[in-house]
Amino acid sequence: MAGCPLAVWIAADSEYVKYCTIYRVSNMSNVHDIWRNVSNVCNVHDIWQNVSNVCNLHGAGRSLRNIYRNSCNISHNIKSVILIVLLILAAVNMRYVHPKGLYIMMLDVGQGDCIYIRDENGISYLFDGGSTDVKQAGKYRIYKTLRYMGIRRIDYAVISHGDADHVNGIKELIDMSGASFTVGEVVMPDIKDKDSEESYAGMIEYAHKAGINISYKKAGDVLVCDNSTAFKITCMHPCESYDYEDANDYSAVYMIEYKDFSMLMMGDAGKKAEKCMMNDWKERKELKVFALKAGHHGSRYSCSEVFLESIDPAIALISCGKDNRYKHPHKEMLTRLHNMDIKPYRTDEDDAIMINVSADKIKVQVYNDSR
Protein backbone atom coordinates (compact mmCIF):
# COMPACT_ATOMS: atom_id res chain seq x y z
CA MET A 1 0.00 0.00 0.00
CA ALA A 2 3.05 2.24 -0.40
CA GLY A 3 2.50 5.55 -2.08
CA CYS A 4 -1.00 6.12 -0.70
CA PRO A 5 -1.27 9.13 1.63
CA LEU A 6 -3.10 9.33 4.88
CA ALA A 7 -6.81 9.11 4.16
CA VAL A 8 -8.70 10.96 6.86
CA TRP A 9 -12.39 11.64 6.44
CA ILE A 10 -13.65 14.16 8.96
CA ALA A 11 -16.88 15.57 7.59
CA ALA A 12 -18.47 18.86 8.47
CA ASP A 13 -21.74 16.98 8.98
CA SER A 14 -21.57 15.07 12.24
CA GLU A 15 -23.68 12.35 10.61
CA TYR A 16 -20.73 11.48 8.37
CA VAL A 17 -18.34 11.43 11.29
CA LYS A 18 -20.33 8.60 12.78
CA TYR A 19 -19.57 6.33 9.85
CA CYS A 20 -16.43 7.58 8.20
CA THR A 21 -13.82 9.09 10.45
CA ILE A 22 -10.39 7.68 9.94
CA TYR A 23 -10.21 5.30 7.02
CA ARG A 24 -6.60 4.25 6.58
CA VAL A 25 -2.98 5.14 7.29
CA SER A 26 -1.07 3.51 4.48
CA ASN A 27 2.17 5.49 4.37
CA MET A 28 3.29 7.09 7.61
CA SER A 29 6.56 8.25 6.05
CA ASN A 30 4.88 10.81 3.84
CA VAL A 31 4.95 13.57 6.43
CA HIS A 32 4.48 16.34 3.89
CA ASP A 33 1.14 14.97 2.68
CA ILE A 34 0.00 14.32 6.23
CA TRP A 35 0.89 17.86 7.28
CA ARG A 36 -0.85 19.34 4.25
CA ASN A 37 -4.08 17.43 4.98
CA VAL A 38 -4.23 18.76 8.53
CA SER A 39 -2.76 22.24 8.19
CA ASN A 40 -5.25 23.19 5.48
CA VAL A 41 -8.04 22.93 8.04
CA CYS A 42 -8.44 26.09 10.08
CA ASN A 43 -9.94 24.93 13.36
CA VAL A 44 -7.74 22.19 14.78
CA HIS A 45 -9.75 22.13 17.98
CA ASP A 46 -12.97 21.32 16.09
CA ILE A 47 -11.21 18.53 14.21
CA TRP A 48 -9.95 17.15 17.48
CA GLN A 49 -13.43 17.11 18.99
CA ASN A 50 -14.76 15.02 16.09
CA VAL A 51 -11.84 12.60 16.21
CA SER A 52 -11.89 12.10 19.96
CA ASN A 53 -15.65 11.55 19.94
CA VAL A 54 -15.30 8.76 17.41
CA CYS A 55 -12.24 7.32 19.12
CA ASN A 56 -14.34 7.05 22.23
CA LEU A 57 -16.37 4.38 20.45
CA HIS A 58 -13.25 2.25 20.52
CA GLY A 59 -12.29 3.01 24.11
CA ALA A 60 -9.40 5.28 23.20
CA GLY A 61 -11.08 8.66 23.34
CA ARG A 62 -10.51 9.45 27.02
CA SER A 63 -6.75 8.89 26.96
CA LEU A 64 -6.27 10.80 23.72
CA ARG A 65 -8.38 13.72 24.96
CA ASN A 66 -6.25 13.97 28.10
CA ILE A 67 -3.10 14.18 25.99
CA TYR A 68 -4.63 16.92 23.90
CA ARG A 69 -5.86 18.93 26.90
CA ASN A 70 -2.37 18.90 28.38
CA SER A 71 -1.13 20.57 25.21
CA CYS A 72 -3.47 23.56 25.49
CA ASN A 73 -0.65 26.01 26.23
CA ILE A 74 1.45 24.84 23.30
CA SER A 75 1.59 26.82 20.07
CA HIS A 76 -0.89 26.13 17.28
CA ASN A 77 1.71 24.49 14.99
CA ILE A 78 3.04 22.16 17.68
CA LYS A 79 -0.52 21.28 18.64
CA SER A 80 -1.18 20.39 15.00
CA VAL A 81 1.81 18.05 15.00
CA ILE A 82 0.51 16.38 18.16
CA LEU A 83 -2.85 15.99 16.46
CA ILE A 84 -1.22 14.31 13.45
CA VAL A 85 0.46 11.76 15.71
CA LEU A 86 -2.79 11.09 17.56
CA LEU A 87 -4.64 10.67 14.26
CA ILE A 88 -2.11 8.07 13.16
CA LEU A 89 -2.37 6.20 16.47
CA ALA A 90 -6.15 6.33 16.33
CA ALA A 91 -6.26 5.09 12.75
CA VAL A 92 -3.97 2.17 13.52
CA ASN A 93 -6.09 1.16 16.51
CA MET A 94 -9.39 1.68 14.71
CA ARG A 95 -8.78 -0.63 11.76
CA TYR A 96 -12.07 -2.27 10.95
CA VAL A 97 -12.25 -6.00 11.63
CA HIS A 98 -15.03 -7.89 9.89
CA PRO A 99 -17.18 -9.89 12.31
CA LYS A 100 -17.27 -13.62 11.74
CA GLY A 101 -20.37 -15.26 10.34
CA LEU A 102 -23.15 -13.24 8.71
CA TYR A 103 -23.04 -9.46 9.08
CA ILE A 104 -25.97 -7.16 8.30
CA MET A 105 -25.99 -3.37 8.58
CA MET A 106 -28.93 -1.10 7.90
CA LEU A 107 -27.30 2.24 7.15
CA ASP A 108 -28.87 5.54 8.14
CA VAL A 109 -29.52 7.22 4.79
CA GLY A 110 -32.37 9.39 5.97
CA GLN A 111 -35.65 8.87 4.12
CA GLY A 112 -34.52 5.96 2.00
CA ASP A 113 -33.25 2.41 2.14
CA CYS A 114 -29.84 0.77 2.26
CA ILE A 115 -28.82 -2.54 3.81
CA TYR A 116 -25.34 -4.00 3.50
CA ILE A 117 -24.82 -7.75 3.96
CA ARG A 118 -21.56 -9.67 4.09
CA ASP A 119 -21.73 -13.46 4.12
CA GLU A 120 -19.33 -15.89 5.74
CA ASN A 121 -17.27 -16.14 2.54
CA GLY A 122 -16.81 -12.38 2.26
CA ILE A 123 -19.31 -11.84 -0.56
CA SER A 124 -20.91 -8.39 -0.31
CA TYR A 125 -24.53 -7.54 -1.06
CA LEU A 126 -26.17 -4.13 -1.06
CA PHE A 127 -29.96 -4.21 -0.84
CA ASP A 128 -31.10 -0.88 -2.25
CA GLY A 129 -29.27 2.39 -1.76
CA GLY A 130 -30.85 5.79 -1.95
CA SER A 131 -32.41 8.73 -0.16
CA THR A 132 -34.75 11.64 -0.83
CA ASP A 133 -33.59 13.92 1.98
CA VAL A 134 -29.84 13.29 2.17
CA LYS A 135 -27.95 14.82 -0.74
CA GLN A 136 -25.52 12.44 -2.45
CA ALA A 137 -26.20 9.71 0.08
CA GLY A 138 -24.40 7.24 -2.16
CA LYS A 139 -21.17 9.20 -2.06
CA TYR A 140 -21.20 10.60 1.46
CA ARG A 141 -23.02 7.93 3.44
CA ILE A 142 -22.90 4.60 1.63
CA TYR A 143 -19.53 4.79 -0.13
CA LYS A 144 -17.66 6.24 2.83
CA THR A 145 -19.14 3.67 5.19
CA LEU A 146 -18.14 0.84 2.88
CA ARG A 147 -14.61 2.18 2.43
CA TYR A 148 -14.17 2.61 6.18
CA MET A 149 -15.12 -1.06 6.50
CA GLY A 150 -12.55 -1.94 3.86
CA ILE A 151 -15.17 -2.90 1.27
CA ARG A 152 -13.80 -2.38 -2.23
CA ARG A 153 -16.45 -4.31 -4.12
CA ILE A 154 -20.20 -4.84 -4.00
CA ASP A 155 -20.72 -8.22 -5.62
CA TYR A 156 -24.50 -7.84 -5.89
CA ALA A 157 -26.48 -4.59 -5.83
CA VAL A 158 -29.97 -5.96 -5.20
CA ILE A 159 -32.63 -3.42 -6.13
CA SER A 160 -36.20 -3.82 -4.93
CA HIS A 161 -37.70 -1.32 -7.40
CA GLY A 162 -36.86 1.85 -9.26
CA ASP A 163 -37.89 4.63 -6.86
CA ALA A 164 -35.20 7.26 -6.27
CA ASP A 165 -35.00 6.66 -2.52
CA HIS A 166 -33.87 3.12 -3.31
CA VAL A 167 -31.60 3.62 -6.33
CA ASN A 168 -30.05 7.09 -6.55
CA GLY A 169 -27.26 6.05 -4.19
CA ILE A 170 -26.65 2.90 -6.24
CA LYS A 171 -26.24 5.08 -9.32
CA GLU A 172 -23.67 7.19 -7.48
CA LEU A 173 -21.73 4.05 -6.55
CA ILE A 174 -21.79 2.98 -10.20
CA ASP A 175 -20.46 6.41 -11.20
CA MET A 176 -17.63 6.00 -8.69
CA SER A 177 -16.68 2.53 -9.89
CA GLY A 178 -13.06 2.20 -10.90
CA ALA A 179 -9.80 0.70 -9.75
CA SER A 180 -10.52 1.18 -6.04
CA PHE A 181 -14.24 0.31 -5.95
CA THR A 182 -16.50 -1.78 -8.17
CA VAL A 183 -20.10 -2.96 -8.46
CA GLY A 184 -20.21 -6.49 -9.80
CA GLU A 185 -23.84 -7.16 -10.73
CA VAL A 186 -27.20 -5.41 -10.48
CA VAL A 187 -30.17 -7.60 -9.55
CA MET A 188 -33.65 -6.36 -10.53
CA PRO A 189 -37.16 -7.74 -9.94
CA ASP A 190 -38.46 -9.66 -12.95
CA ILE A 191 -41.61 -7.80 -14.02
CA LYS A 192 -43.77 -8.09 -17.12
CA ASP A 193 -43.57 -4.64 -18.71
CA LYS A 194 -39.96 -3.69 -18.14
CA ASP A 195 -40.01 -0.81 -20.61
CA SER A 196 -43.24 0.75 -19.34
CA GLU A 197 -41.84 1.56 -15.89
CA GLU A 198 -39.71 4.67 -16.44
CA SER A 199 -37.68 4.48 -13.21
CA TYR A 200 -37.17 0.73 -13.64
CA ALA A 201 -36.04 1.06 -17.25
CA GLY A 202 -33.81 3.98 -16.29
CA MET A 203 -31.95 1.87 -13.73
CA ILE A 204 -31.40 -0.88 -16.30
CA GLU A 205 -30.06 1.62 -18.84
CA TYR A 206 -27.75 3.14 -16.20
CA ALA A 207 -26.20 -0.24 -15.39
CA HIS A 208 -25.90 -1.18 -19.08
CA LYS A 209 -24.03 2.02 -19.91
CA ALA A 210 -21.58 1.26 -17.12
CA GLY A 211 -21.02 -2.24 -18.49
CA ILE A 212 -22.49 -3.91 -15.41
CA ASN A 213 -24.25 -7.23 -15.76
CA ILE A 214 -27.97 -7.31 -14.86
CA SER A 215 -29.97 -10.30 -13.68
CA TYR A 216 -33.69 -10.57 -12.95
CA LYS A 217 -35.37 -12.44 -10.11
CA LYS A 218 -38.96 -13.46 -9.44
CA ALA A 219 -40.61 -15.43 -6.66
CA GLY A 220 -38.89 -18.78 -6.21
CA ASP A 221 -35.60 -17.76 -7.82
CA VAL A 222 -32.48 -18.27 -5.72
CA LEU A 223 -29.87 -15.51 -5.81
CA VAL A 224 -27.29 -17.51 -3.89
CA CYS A 225 -27.20 -20.87 -2.14
CA ASP A 226 -24.08 -22.00 -0.29
CA ASN A 227 -24.61 -25.40 1.29
CA SER A 228 -21.21 -25.29 2.96
CA THR A 229 -22.21 -22.32 5.10
CA ALA A 230 -26.00 -22.82 5.10
CA PHE A 231 -26.43 -19.37 3.54
CA LYS A 232 -29.22 -18.71 1.07
CA ILE A 233 -30.99 -15.75 -0.51
CA THR A 234 -34.34 -16.45 -2.16
CA CYS A 235 -36.65 -14.08 -4.01
CA MET A 236 -40.17 -14.23 -2.54
CA HIS A 237 -41.90 -11.57 -4.66
CA PRO A 238 -43.03 -10.59 -7.31
CA CYS A 239 -44.74 -13.66 -8.71
CA GLU A 240 -44.46 -14.33 -12.43
CA SER A 241 -48.13 -13.55 -13.13
CA TYR A 242 -48.40 -10.71 -10.62
CA ASP A 243 -50.44 -7.68 -11.68
CA TYR A 244 -48.96 -4.57 -10.12
CA GLU A 245 -50.40 -1.08 -9.95
CA ASP A 246 -47.23 0.85 -9.14
CA ALA A 247 -43.54 0.40 -8.36
CA ASN A 248 -44.15 -0.38 -4.70
CA ASP A 249 -46.46 -3.20 -5.76
CA TYR A 250 -43.74 -5.06 -7.64
CA SER A 251 -41.06 -4.29 -5.06
CA ALA A 252 -38.84 -7.35 -4.74
CA VAL A 253 -38.89 -9.23 -1.44
CA TYR A 254 -36.01 -11.48 -0.39
CA MET A 255 -35.56 -14.08 2.30
CA ILE A 256 -32.11 -14.22 3.91
CA GLU A 257 -31.30 -17.53 5.60
CA TYR A 258 -28.18 -18.46 7.52
CA LYS A 259 -28.16 -21.47 9.83
CA ASP A 260 -31.07 -20.86 12.26
CA PHE A 261 -31.37 -17.16 11.39
CA SER A 262 -33.76 -15.72 8.82
CA MET A 263 -34.69 -12.21 7.72
CA LEU A 264 -37.33 -10.97 5.32
CA MET A 265 -36.36 -7.93 3.22
CA MET A 266 -39.56 -6.18 2.15
CA GLY A 267 -38.32 -3.23 0.10
CA ASP A 268 -41.40 -1.02 -0.35
CA ALA A 269 -43.87 -3.91 -0.49
CA GLY A 270 -47.23 -3.29 1.18
CA LYS A 271 -50.45 -5.14 1.98
CA LYS A 272 -51.14 -6.33 -1.57
CA ALA A 273 -47.72 -7.94 -1.88
CA GLU A 274 -48.04 -9.38 1.63
CA LYS A 275 -51.32 -11.03 0.71
CA CYS A 276 -49.87 -12.41 -2.52
CA MET A 277 -46.91 -13.93 -0.68
CA MET A 278 -49.08 -15.48 2.02
CA ASN A 279 -51.17 -17.18 -0.66
CA ASP A 280 -48.00 -18.62 -2.18
CA TRP A 281 -46.83 -19.75 1.25
CA LYS A 282 -49.85 -21.94 1.93
CA GLU A 283 -47.91 -24.98 0.79
CA ARG A 284 -45.23 -24.24 3.37
CA LYS A 285 -46.21 -25.35 6.84
CA GLU A 286 -44.15 -22.71 8.58
CA LEU A 287 -42.47 -19.49 7.56
CA LYS A 288 -41.12 -17.78 10.64
CA VAL A 289 -38.36 -15.19 10.65
CA PHE A 290 -36.19 -13.62 13.32
CA ALA A 291 -35.95 -10.21 11.63
CA LEU A 292 -38.23 -8.24 9.35
CA LYS A 293 -37.12 -5.26 7.31
CA ALA A 294 -40.43 -3.37 7.40
CA GLY A 295 -41.91 -2.50 4.03
CA HIS A 296 -42.14 1.08 2.77
CA HIS A 297 -40.32 2.71 5.69
CA GLY A 298 -42.96 1.56 8.16
CA SER A 299 -45.91 3.17 6.39
CA ARG A 300 -49.48 2.80 7.59
CA TYR A 301 -50.19 0.17 4.94
CA SER A 302 -47.22 -2.07 5.61
CA CYS A 303 -46.83 -4.88 8.14
CA SER A 304 -50.47 -5.89 8.35
CA GLU A 305 -51.54 -7.79 11.44
CA VAL A 306 -52.23 -11.03 9.57
CA PHE A 307 -48.84 -10.80 7.86
CA LEU A 308 -47.02 -10.26 11.13
CA GLU A 309 -48.85 -13.22 12.65
CA SER A 310 -47.78 -15.31 9.68
CA ILE A 311 -44.05 -14.62 9.96
CA ASP A 312 -43.86 -13.90 13.72
CA PRO A 313 -40.63 -11.84 13.77
CA ALA A 314 -38.76 -10.99 16.96
CA ILE A 315 -37.52 -7.63 15.65
CA ALA A 316 -38.43 -5.19 12.88
CA LEU A 317 -35.95 -2.84 11.19
CA ILE A 318 -37.38 0.44 9.90
CA SER A 319 -35.46 2.79 7.60
CA CYS A 320 -36.78 6.35 7.69
CA GLY A 321 -35.58 9.93 7.93
CA LYS A 322 -35.77 11.95 11.11
CA ASP A 323 -38.89 14.17 11.19
CA ASN A 324 -39.73 13.08 7.64
CA ARG A 325 -42.76 14.64 5.97
CA TYR A 326 -44.44 11.26 5.50
CA LYS A 327 -44.59 10.67 9.27
CA HIS A 328 -42.87 7.31 8.85
CA PRO A 329 -43.05 5.04 10.71
CA HIS A 330 -46.81 5.36 11.10
CA LYS A 331 -48.16 5.10 14.62
CA GLU A 332 -50.68 2.41 13.60
CA MET A 333 -47.89 0.23 12.26
CA LEU A 334 -45.88 0.75 15.44
CA THR A 335 -48.94 -0.20 17.48
CA ARG A 336 -49.22 -3.46 15.56
CA LEU A 337 -45.58 -4.22 16.33
CA HIS A 338 -46.09 -3.37 20.00
CA ASN A 339 -49.21 -5.51 20.31
CA MET A 340 -47.31 -8.50 18.94
CA ASP A 341 -44.23 -7.89 21.10
CA ILE A 342 -42.02 -7.17 18.08
CA LYS A 343 -39.12 -4.88 18.97
CA PRO A 344 -38.69 -2.02 16.49
CA TYR A 345 -35.31 -0.62 15.46
CA ARG A 346 -35.42 2.70 13.61
CA THR A 347 -32.69 4.53 11.75
CA ASP A 348 -34.23 7.90 12.67
CA GLU A 349 -33.60 7.09 16.34
CA ASP A 350 -30.96 4.35 16.39
CA ASP A 351 -28.86 5.46 13.40
CA ALA A 352 -27.12 2.42 11.91
CA ILE A 353 -28.47 -0.98 12.99
CA MET A 354 -26.19 -4.00 12.95
CA ILE A 355 -26.96 -7.72 13.17
CA ASN A 356 -24.15 -10.24 13.54
CA VAL A 357 -25.02 -13.93 13.31
CA SER A 358 -22.26 -16.27 14.44
CA ALA A 359 -22.28 -20.00 15.05
CA ASP A 360 -23.99 -19.80 18.42
CA LYS A 361 -25.66 -16.41 18.79
CA ILE A 362 -27.43 -13.48 17.17
CA LYS A 363 -26.21 -10.05 18.23
CA VAL A 364 -28.18 -6.88 17.48
CA GLN A 365 -26.51 -3.50 18.00
CA VAL A 366 -27.33 0.11 17.20
CA TYR A 367 -24.96 2.99 16.63
CA ASN A 368 -26.92 5.34 18.89
CA ASP A 369 -27.38 3.41 22.13
CA SER A 370 -28.32 6.47 24.19
CA ARG A 371 -32.04 5.69 24.24
Ranges and model annotations:
Residues 1-36, 42-49, 55-371:
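Non-globular, low-confidence helical/coil segments that flank catalytic cores
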